[in-house]
Each structure stands twice: as C-alpha cells, then as structure tokens.
C-alpha cells in the first residue's frame, strides 16, 4: 500500500475517460440492436488485456453547461435514474472532487451500495465537461465489494449551437469479473448464452439498469419534462460561482508541489509556469496594500468602462449586464506583439463586512480571433480586497493559458510581459483610485505601461503594433523585473541587507554556518522590535500632546484646514513612487461569519491522500485517508496544512518566524517540518555517483543455498521418511529459534540513554511498542524518564506502571539480567561475574557522540523518535565541515615506529598494520591502543570478519574478529576482545604474498608479484589463479562484490606496468585493461556502479567508464608534488581523498553528477575491447582537466552503443599537511577518515 495524492488520481481517471471517449486507436464495434437514430452504442473486448469496453454517444437539446449541472447535482440522480434509490455526497474535497454514495436496485438484485470517487473537469471556455468515477474503499466499507474501473460522461458543446450538446459515456470492466459473474446485476442463465446478453444486465454507475441505451432514454425523458426548470438559471452565473471557488483553491495548489515552476519571485508577488501538451499555464499571485477602502477599490475594478485600469487591453466593450454583479465583456487583449479578441465574464462582490472582490474568466467566444496561431485565455482570476485599518489589503491571482508560441525565446518574452503587466496593473489601480478620490496632487503617479491607443494614437490594433511600442514595453518590463529574483519573502529589507552583508563576509572567511546566521538574525529582529516599540511610544506621546493642545486652545480649530494642507504636503514628500506592500495581515475579523484577511501565500486547499494497493489483484482499488480541515484561521489549521505553508521556507526564515508569536514557535518546532527540510536540503543529498548497498553475509548464505540445492538434485529425490524427518527437524529448529529470540538480550551497543524510547527498548528486546495514542506515548516517556541510572532500584516499580501494550513486551523473568546489562553500559560497576575485559583495557571510554559514532550496523531509532531539528542542525554543520575540510578534531594514534601498511575501521574501533610486524587495535573515542598483536612474519593486510557479531557486549563495534594476512602466505583469524588476544584459526594457502583481500566472506584473494590467487577457505580449494596478471609487480588489488559488470563481483588490480585491470571474480577472466597513465598505477577506487578512479606516480587521477574502458573519460592533474599512493571515496558526502608521497592529503568535492541516462548494457566480451563505442565527455573542475574523445570498433556489431556519462564537478577543495612523511593509506566513512604515513603516524580526522 502507498499514499497517492488525490489530484493525481483525479487526473488519471479523467484522462482515462477522455482517452476512451475520443481515441481512434480502439477498434470499436457498433451494436446495431442497441443503437437507434438518437444514439449509437459501441463495444470492444480485449482478451489479451482482459478488459471489456463500451461507449455510447447521443445528442441532446440542452446546453452542455446545463447538462453538466444536471449530472453533477447528486441530489437529482434519483429523479432521472429510475433504479437509484439514494445518492448523496459523503465528502467534498473541492468543487471538482467528491466521494459519493449510490444505492441501486434492479430485478436481479434487491439492493446495491457503491462508494465512488468522482472527479470532474470543468472548461466553459472549450465547452468541454467530464465527470469520471471509480470505486473507493472507505473505512467501514465492504473490502470485497465489486471494483468499478474508471468510467463516466464526457459532455461537448456543438459549435454554433448554444443550446445543444453531445454526450459520450464510457464504461469498462474486467472480463474475468464477467466470467466469474462478480458484476452486480449480471447473471448468466445459460453457458450458451450470447456474449452480448450481459450488456443488458450489467449495472454501472453511469448506466441505468445496465442497458447502455437506457441512460440516454431516461435522461432525455427527464429533460423534456423539466426543460423550463433546467434552463431557468443563466448558466453564466453558475460559471462565475465556480470561478470564485476555483480561485480560492488555486491559491494553494499553484506551487512547485503541484508541478508549477517559479519564473519570478518578489517580496509581494510571484510568477509560476506549468507546461501542457498544447502550451502552458501562467499564474501571477501576490498582494499589495493601499490606503483606500475595499469598496472603493471594487468600484474602480468594476467601473462602467470595463477594465479601463488594465493597460494591456487595446479596447473593451460591454456585451451584456447579466445582473447587477455579473456582466459579459468583449476585450481586445495584447500579449506582446499580438492583439487577441476574447469574451470574459466579470463579477463583483461587496461584503459581507469590510470586503470586496472582482473575478473574471474567459468563456467560449463566437468572435474569438487567433493571431498568428496564438491563443490566450483567462483562467479564473480575481482581486480580493480585505479591510485593513483605514485602508485595505489586496490579494490577487491572475491565471492565463497560452497556446501557439513555438520558440523558447517567444515563451520567455510572453512570460516577461505577463510579469510586467502584473506590476503595471497594480500601479494603474492605485493611480485610478487616486484620481477618483481627487488626490492626484498628493501622490505622484506610479509608473505603468501605456495602452496602444495612449501611446500610438489612432493607429489601432488592426494595423499592427509599431516596433516602437514593442521596444517600449520590453524596456519597461526589464526595468521592473531587473531585481525581481533578488527579493526575499519573509525578512525585512533592513535585515536582508544586513544578512547579505554578513553572508558575503562569511563566504570570504569560509565560515558560513547556520548557527551564526541564526544568532545574527535573532539579534537583528530584536533590534527591529525595540525600534518599533520606541517609535510607537513616541507616536503615542505626540498624540497625547496634540490632544492637550487641542483642549487648551479651541480657537485653533479654525486653523485645521491649513494644518491639513501642511500634513498633505509633508505626506506627498514622504511617499515614494513605488508600490506599497505589507508582509503579515492576521489583524482583523471582518464579519461575524469569520471572514478574515488571508495572505496570498497561505494554502487554502485541503490536502487529500488516498491509499492505493500495490496488489495485482486489486490494482485500481483506492482507500480514503481522512483529513480534517478548517479555514477559520491559522490557529485552527491542521498540522498538515501548516507544514505545507512553512515547507517552502529556509531554515533561517523558519527560525525568524518562530520569534513572531507563540503559535509560530510551536509550529516551527514540528519534527515533520525539520524532517522535510532535512530530506529536501541538497547539501545532504548531493548528486554524486553511488553504488547499490551490498550485505556481505547474505552473499555467502545465498551461495551455500545454491550449493546445497545443487547437491540435492545430484543425489536424487529423498524418500518419504527422510522428508518427514526433515520437516520434524525444521519444526524443532523453529521452536529453538523462537525460544532463543525470547531469551536473548537486546544489543545495547550505542543505546542513547538520554532517549526514553531508546532506553525502553532495552527492556522490550528492541521492539518499539505500536498502536499507542499520542497521550500514551507521552505517558510512557514520562515513566521511563524517571529511571535513575545511578540507582536502578526503582526500575521494577516503574515498569509496572507502563500500559498493558508495553508491559506485554517485557519478560519479567529476564528483568534482572537486563538491569545488570544496563548498569554495565551506563558506566556503573558490575556486581555479578568477572569484570569485563574491555573495562580493563579502556576504562576511560566515553560514550559515542554524533561525531565519532561510526557503526553503520548500530541501532537506528525509528524516524518518529528522531529530534529532526537537532538532526538537521548537526548534519548541516557536519556537511559544511566536509565541504570546507575543517575537522572538529584531529586525534593522533601513536604507537607505531615504521611505515603504516593498512588501516581498517569498524564502528568506533580501528586496526592499523605497520612494517614492524605489529598490529594495533584502537579505541577511536579516546585514541588509546586497547590491544596489540605481533606476527611471526610481516603483516600485510587486515579486515574485519562481518560474518558473525561478537558474543560480548562491546560499545565500540559489533565485530571483533579480524583476518590477518602475513608475508609468508599465512592467514590468521583473531578475536581482539579476548585478553590476551585469542587466535581462532590459521591457514596457509600460499608460500609468499604481497597482499590479501578478505572482502568476500569465505574467500581469500592473494597476490604476489604478478600472480593472483583466489581461494575457498572452507574447502581449501584454489578457485582460480592468474600467473601473469601484469608484466610488473602488482601494487594493489581490491574486490567489489556484486558489480554491474558481473553479478558475482569483480577484482581491480593495479601495477607498476602503468596499467590497471578488471577481472571477473567467478572465473578470473580479464574484463578490461585500463591503460593511460605515464607511470606506475598505485591505487584504484570504485566510483558509483560504472566508474573507477585510479591514482598514479604521474600525480594524476583518471576516471574510467568500466563499460568502455579503452581509454579514460577524464583526467585530473592534482596539486600533489609527489606520487599518489592511496585514494578513498566517501560517497555519502561525495568526497574523494588522495594521499601522496609529499605528505599531503587533498580532498575533492563531487556534485551535480547526472547519471540518469546510464543504462545497463549487455555483459562485455572479455577480449579487452568492448567495441562499438563512441562518446565525448567533459567535466567542470578547478584543476586541470583533460577531455577525451574515444572511438573504437570491432567486428561484433551486435553490441549496443553505450550511453555517455555526464560528469559533474570534481573540485579540489583543500590540501591538508598534518603528516610529515608520505601518506600510505586512507580509510574513510561518513564521520571522518583515518590516514597512515611512512613514519608510523596515524591520524584520526573527525568531522
């Protein structure tokens, strides 16, 4: 099951119904016995897709608008549908989407209830209307109810005929439902009955009694008997009523979450664009304030000469006044170079309360003119004026649909003109109101775009637009929009300037950290609040003084006209020729009905989701997810809507908003908000090459299963007695496993003792209690938080106070043991048994923190219990430190005296190997050595054994067993948690070795000089070897499990012969040879699924596409002054680290890598040449980059062409010089990295 946006389901249903109604690809068959002169019935059966379709078409003597209203009105369904007993709306999401309930009956069934999700398309401009329905499963509904696939009506207006329409209805069902007689109202009386018989008996919501022709007959009968009542109301009034509803919903749904792209965003307005199949939609929405009342603004917007204030209309004409508040207007609208004639409906409302509104939208026009193939239509548009003190606050939304502009440049110009028009009309409205009130001398006119008539005289729209006028309009738009994208939408201009200045300084100092920005913003806001309070106090004092003077000197009242003139003159000087704007308007309640100013950026549409089944048996079934919604005020909005409102803000702006009031503080502390911020922040989700996650232990298990299965098949089938014995053994094993799971103790490593839920899981064996109410969760947290870690004597008493659901998860017979383990992990001395060997070796062992917690397999709490605000802040700091390569701590791990050969880390532990035959085990929390091991022969390689976790509770790592490879070919496994260190296993696959790789469980990869061996540990079998893998000594070998080139894994090798090779791990076949370096290749690292990075003595890094490895795809000349010895790729943060003989480590930041066009190709032919390859690649980097173009061909023309990889940035960020000798090895993870050098120094870098 998954949640799907209800709008997406609506669009899908409507699209499916339209496709069935108008598609010419469906081979319909006309049903002659069902059709008549008035209607035509078609059908189609597809046994391949298992679906049956039927379609009916008829014409009616009624307008399409009235037909749509008739079918939409659910209360009238029972009036024209003789088999419908009851019909009503269960839930209304908006004026186009509803859940309805229908109750039917027919001769074969006494009663049938159906719940349907109804979606509508309403387009009066094209005179096209759609009503689509499909089954929906409610909480109290029948799960096994018959599922109705998308079906419904399509209503079209006939050109040139106002009161006539064509209606098409479609329905579909699964053939399987017909065969099994699952469809209500259908019953096959005889298996030999003809297929078409069920058409008369099938019952669908769009039909009456199942007969496709019956629906036309019943509707036509109802219309003929009630035609006067149906056509009494002018349909244009209904159009405007729906336009008013749609505008309110469009405020909340025209945002990036619904597929809109922001073209321009200013402090008080924004322009959004959404592409369509035939053109695109444009929305301009925003707000402005003025000192004029809403009633006065409505008089100007709805004045006698329509749209006189709109400077983009060449001319307008009143067609008809429908009533006192709605009229039809013909306008000549200029969009850039073209004048388009269209019809609009415009309405005005005043009240209730101190409120007014003006709405308009395009309708089907008999005189509509298309200029140069370009069409422009108005979608529902409005200006809403709310009383604000003595003035008003205006919220506006302008929406148009554009078709026909063929080039991106023309689209850009039209969008620019639309944005400029929005600004020009705001100014024009203020100018017109100012003239109407006679205040033109008080305020300077705001800049507007003049109309063609005003600018060009009597040229007229029929002659064409002069080039001078086009240039003037474009220049005006450029001036108005020059700084359009630099405005903010939350902080004040003063704070914004300060923040920009601070950000510039911080960027110069590489110190742009979120906490410093937050502190600066908080200080600025506090200063602004103090200044505002001081100004208000001064104004109050001045008013009091003025009142005293007025009372003491009544004779001065005669001088008031002179004072007013002086005040007006002063006001004229202070007002600037710019558009006034405000930010927040939650100030007034305009009427008893609760109508109030609602800011343009508030979401006014209820979010609704549906559960959609992933099951193939119930493919289209959807379930309702209930959401409660209120528009009465911000305090009454549900949290879902609050999060939608705040989700578009940045972290800094959210902190600023939290300082406004207590309600905003509570809302901005929501974990959902910070969780969305975290998951949407590109800093945490860089576009870097990533590999699929591989779990090593499962690989060996799968192989064992394959081997055991093959063995069984070779031995033949087992006897019945053996099978019964196997079943008994399996049952016994299952019982034993269940008992062990009940008795085992939950792994306490890395438990957060400060988190009540995490602490509770100690007693519930790691199980998180489910089905707890929010109140119960708070109570449980309160009880668990009372546990005193310094005195655990009250644990049993507190446990008894927990709810039954939680108490049932705790086994009381193991409570004492869990308290004992809890005392150990919390740092208290153990009272039972001997002291832990870990305490002997690392007594000063602090608890893991956010910076050094490195165990990838440690306990990860459920997202519900994560403090997302702290998590976001911490991750933001860490990511910034990685980008700037500024570790919070560098810990030296001292103990070696000679060169470091290898470094491995796991959790908060690490292993280092030096040429002095010594291995050291480290506690990364403290930097202390907690164990030593010295081999008889030189140690070359080490690796943690991940096949089995440690039997002891140890907070540093889950794994304590280590594979050790020696120079004499010996492989030893030790467990360093035991003191002294215990040798578990020893084997000697070969006599000499230069290195080992223990990545693959149960397998050893060994190389010596130019030879590679691959051994099976359990059988002591040499799986394969290559005696001449390279012509010179192998410098490194590395296994990559389950690679795209081979499901079983591949092997990388590098050599002094200037090459690197890729081998198939299963059989040792050479897949690719990477040739391109001028000196020895010393190291290699996989990058993503298809690439590899090599480092060489020639001081360069080269990137290879392993599917076309005839040459490298990019080369990076580093700033190293010596040979590159080691590289490591930390894919979580997109960082490549390279170590060199010059003692430096250089970090490279990877980002903006587009790997979406990479597809899996056929397995390469193992002849060192892929074949049929042609590619050109480039990359952006601050270092010297070599761009290569390669083309090679082979005789095998069946191999498909491999797509190009689009590289991203590979930026040299910083050079670290903490090592005094050559860097020999690097091991990295998300928390930091460890580096070893030639003089034996090991450094731990924590980020």
From Swiss-Prot:
Pfam families: F-box-like, START, WD40
WD repeat residues: 895-934, 945-984, 988-1025, 1029-1073, 1076-1114, 1119-1158, 1218-1247
Repeat listed as a keyword: yes
Null allele phenotype: Cells preferentially form spores within chimeric cell populations and are more likely to survive adverse conditions than their wild type counterparts, which accumulate preferentially within the stalk. Such mutants have been termed 'cheaters'. Over time, mutant cheaters may be expected to dominate mixed populations, as they ensure their own survival at the expense of their altruistic wild type counterparts. The spread of cheater mutants may be limited by the high degree of relatedness within naturally occurring populations of Dictyostelium discoideum.
A molecular function GO annotation: ubiquitin-protein transferase activity
Biased composition (Low complexity): 552-566, 707-719, 726-744
SMART domains tied to this protein: FBOX, WD40
Keywords: Developmental protein, Differentiation, Fruiting body, Repeat, Sporulation, Ubl conjugation pathway, WD repeat
Top-level taxon of the source organism: Eukaryota
Keyword Translocase tagged: no
Domain START intervals: 1-214
Span of domain F-box: 631-677
Region (Disordered): 484-514, 552-576, 697-744, 833-856
GO term, biological process aspect, one: cell differentiation
Cellular component aspect of the GO annotation: SCF ubiquitin ligase complex
Residue stretches of biased makeup (Polar residues): 833-846
UniProt subunit comment: Component of an SCF complex including at least culA. Formation of this complex appears to require activity of the MAP kinase erk2. Interacts with regA.
Annotated function: Substrate recognition component of a SCF (SKP1-CUL1-F-box protein) E3 ubiquitin-protein ligase complex which mediates the ubiquitination and subsequent proteasomal degradation of target proteins. May target the cAMP phosphodiesterase regA for degradation leading to an increase in cAMP and PKA activity. Promotes development of prestalk cells as opposed to prespores within the developing fruiting body. Required for culmination and fruiting body development.
Descriptive protein name: F-box/WD repeat-containing protein A
Organism whose genome encodes this protein: Dictyostelium discoideum
Origin organism lineage: Eukaryota, Amoebozoa, Evosea, Eumycetozoa, Dictyostelia
């Amino acid at each position: 099951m998954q949640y799907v946006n209800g709008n997406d389901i609506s669009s899908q249903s409507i699209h499916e119904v339209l496709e069935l109604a108008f598609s010419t690809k469906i081979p319909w068959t006309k049903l002659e016995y069902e059709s008549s002169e008035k209607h035509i019935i078609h059908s189609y059966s597809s046994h391949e897709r298992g679906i049956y379709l039927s379609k009916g078409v008829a014409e009616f003597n009624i307008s399409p608008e009235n037909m749509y209203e008739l079918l939409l009105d659910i209360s009238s369904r029972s009036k024209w549908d003789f088999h419908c007993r009851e019909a009503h709306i269960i839930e209304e999401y908006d004026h186009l989407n509803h859940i309805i309930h229908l109750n039917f009956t027919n001769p074969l069934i006494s009663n049938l209830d159906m719940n349907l999700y109804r979606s509508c398309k309403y387009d009066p401009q094209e005179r096209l209307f759609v009503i689509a329905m499909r089954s929906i499963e409610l909480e109290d509904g029948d799960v096994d109810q018959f599922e109705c696939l998308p079906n419904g009506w399509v209503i079209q207006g006939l050109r040139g005929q106002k009161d006539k329409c064509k209606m098409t209805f479609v329905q579909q069902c699964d053939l399987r439902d017909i065969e099994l007689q699952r469809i209500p109202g259908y019953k096959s009386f005889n298996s030999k009955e003809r297929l078409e018989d069920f058409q008369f008996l099938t019952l669908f919501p769009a039909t009456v009694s199942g007969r496709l022709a019956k629906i036309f007959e019943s509707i036509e009968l109802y219309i003929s008997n009630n035609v006067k009542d149906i056509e009494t109301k002018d349909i244009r009034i209904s159009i405007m009523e729906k336009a008013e509803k749609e505008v309110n919903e469009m405020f909340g749904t025209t945002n990036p979450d619904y597929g809109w792209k922001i073209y321009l965003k200013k402090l008080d307005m924004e322009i959004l664009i959404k592409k369509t199949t035939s053109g695109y939609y444009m929305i301009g929405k925003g707000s402005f304030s003025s000192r004029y009342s809403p009633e006065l603004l409505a008089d100007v917007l709805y004045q006698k000469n329509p749209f006189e204030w709109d400077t983009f209309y060449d001319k307008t004409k009143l067609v008809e006044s429908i009533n006192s508040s709605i009229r039809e207007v013909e306008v000549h609208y200029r969009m850039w170079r073209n004048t388009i004639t269209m019809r609009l409906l415009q309405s005005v409302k005043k009240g209730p309360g101190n409120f007014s509104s003006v709405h308009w939208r395009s309708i089907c026009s008999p005189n509509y003119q298309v200029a140069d193939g370009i069409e422009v239509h108005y979608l529902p548009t409005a200006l809403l004026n709310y009383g604000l003190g003595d003035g008003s606050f205006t919220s506006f939304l302008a929406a148009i649909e554009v078709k026909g502009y063929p080039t991106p440049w023309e689209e850009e110009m039209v969008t620019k003109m639309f944005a400029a028009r929005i600004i020009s009309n705001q100014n024009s409205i203020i100018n017109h109101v100012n003239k109407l009130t006679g205040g033109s001398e008080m305020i300077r006119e705001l800049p507007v775009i003049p109309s063609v008539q005003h600018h060009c005289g009597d040229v007229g729209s029929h002659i064409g637009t002069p080039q001078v006028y086009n240039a003037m309009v474009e220049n005006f738009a450029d001036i108005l929009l020059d700084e359009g994208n630099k405005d903010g939408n939350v902080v004040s201009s003063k704070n914004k300037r300060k923040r920009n200045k601070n950000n510039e300084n911080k960027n110069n100092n590489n110190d742009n950290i979120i906490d410093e920005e937050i502190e600066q913003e908080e200080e600025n806001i506090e200063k602004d609040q103090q200044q505002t309070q001081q100004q208000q106090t001064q104004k109050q004092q001045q008013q009091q003084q003025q009142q005293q003077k007025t009372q003491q000197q009544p004779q001065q009242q005669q001088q008031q006209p002179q004072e007013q003139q002086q005040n007006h003159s002063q006001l004229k000087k202070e007002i600037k020729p710019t558009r006034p704007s405000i930010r927040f308007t939650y100030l007034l309640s305009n009427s008893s009905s609760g109508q109030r100013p609602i800011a343009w950026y508030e979401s006014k549409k209820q979010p609704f989701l549906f559960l959609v089944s992933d099951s193939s048996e119930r493919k289209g079934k959807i379930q309702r997810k209930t959401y409660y919604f209120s528009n009465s005020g911000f305090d009454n909005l549900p949290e879902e809507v609050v999060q939608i409102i705040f989700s578009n803000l940045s972290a800094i702006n959210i902190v600023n908003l939290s300082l406004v009031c207590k309600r905003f503080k509570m809302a901005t502390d929501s974990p959902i908000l910070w969780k969305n911020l975290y998951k949407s922040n590109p800093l945490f989700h860089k576009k870097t090459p990533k590999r699929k996650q591989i779990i090593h232990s499962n690989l060996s298990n799968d192989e064992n299963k394959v081997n055991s299965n093959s063995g069984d098949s070779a031995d033949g089938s087992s006897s019945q007695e053996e099978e019964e014995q196997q079943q008994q053994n399996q049952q016994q094993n299952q019982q034993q496993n269940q008992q062990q799971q009940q008795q085992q103790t939950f792994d306490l490593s890395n438990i957060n003792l400060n988190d009540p839920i995490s602490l509770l899981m100690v007693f519930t064996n790691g199980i998180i209690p489910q089905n707890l109410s929010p109140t119960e969760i708070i109570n449980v947290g309160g009880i668990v938080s009372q546990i005193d870690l310094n005195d655990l004597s009250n644990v049993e008493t507190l446990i008894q106070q927990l709810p039954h659901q939680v108490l049932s998860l705790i086994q009381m017979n193991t409570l004492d043991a869990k308290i004992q383990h809890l005392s150990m992990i919390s740092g208290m001395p153990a009272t039972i048994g001997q002291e832990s060997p870990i305490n002997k070796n690392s007594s000063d062992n602090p608890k893991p923190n956010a910076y050094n917690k490195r165990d990838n397999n440690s306990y990860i709490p459920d997202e519900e219990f994560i403090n997302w605000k702290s998590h976001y802040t911490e991750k933001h700091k860490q990511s910034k430190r990685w980008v700037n390569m500024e570790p919070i701590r560098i810990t030296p791990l001292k103990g070696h005296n000679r060169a470091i050969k290898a470094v491995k880390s796991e959790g908060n532990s690490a292993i280092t190997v030096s040429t002095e035959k010594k291995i050291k085990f480290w506690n990364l929390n403290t930097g202390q050595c907690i164990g030593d091991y010295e081999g008889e022969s030189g140690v070359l390689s080490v690796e943690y054994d991940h096949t089995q976790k440690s039997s002891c509770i140890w907070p540093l790592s889950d794994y304590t067993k280590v594979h050790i490879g020696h120079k004499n070919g010996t492989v030893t496994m030790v467990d360093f948690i035991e003191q002294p260190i215990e040798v578990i296993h020893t084997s000697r696959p070969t006599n000499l070795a230069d290195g080992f790789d223990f990545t693959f469980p149960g397998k050893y990869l060994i190389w010596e000089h130019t030879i590679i061996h691959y051994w099976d540990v359990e059988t002591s079998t040499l799986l394969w070897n290559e005696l001449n893998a390279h012509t010179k000594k192998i410098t490194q070998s590395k296994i990559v499990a389950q690679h795209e080139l081979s499901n079983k894994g591949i092997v990388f090798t590098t050599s002094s012969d200037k090459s690197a090779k890729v081998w198939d791990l299963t059989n040792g076949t050479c897949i690719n040879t990477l040739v391109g370096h001028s000196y020895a290749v010393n190291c290699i690292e996989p990058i993503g699924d298809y690439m590899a990075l090599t480092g060489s003595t020639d001081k360069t890094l080269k990137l290879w596409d392993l599917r076309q490895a005839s040459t490298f795809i990019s080369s990076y000349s580093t700033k190293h002054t010596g040979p590159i010895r080691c590289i490591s790729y930390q894919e979580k943060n997109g960082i490549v680290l390279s170590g060199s003989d010059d003692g430096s480590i250089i970090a490279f930041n990877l980002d903006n890598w587009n790997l979406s066009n990479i597809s899996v190709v056929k397995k390469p032919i193992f002849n060192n040449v892929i074949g049929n390859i042609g590619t050109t690649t480039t990359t952006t980097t601050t270092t010297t980059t070599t761009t290569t173009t390669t083309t090679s061909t082979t005789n095998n023309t069946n191999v498909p062409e491999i797509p190009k990889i689009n590289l991203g940035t590979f930026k040299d960020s910083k050079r670290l010089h903490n090592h005094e000798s050559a860097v020999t090895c690097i091991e990295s993870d998300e928390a930091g990295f460890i580096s070893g050098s030639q003089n034996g120094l090991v450094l731990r870098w924590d980020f």
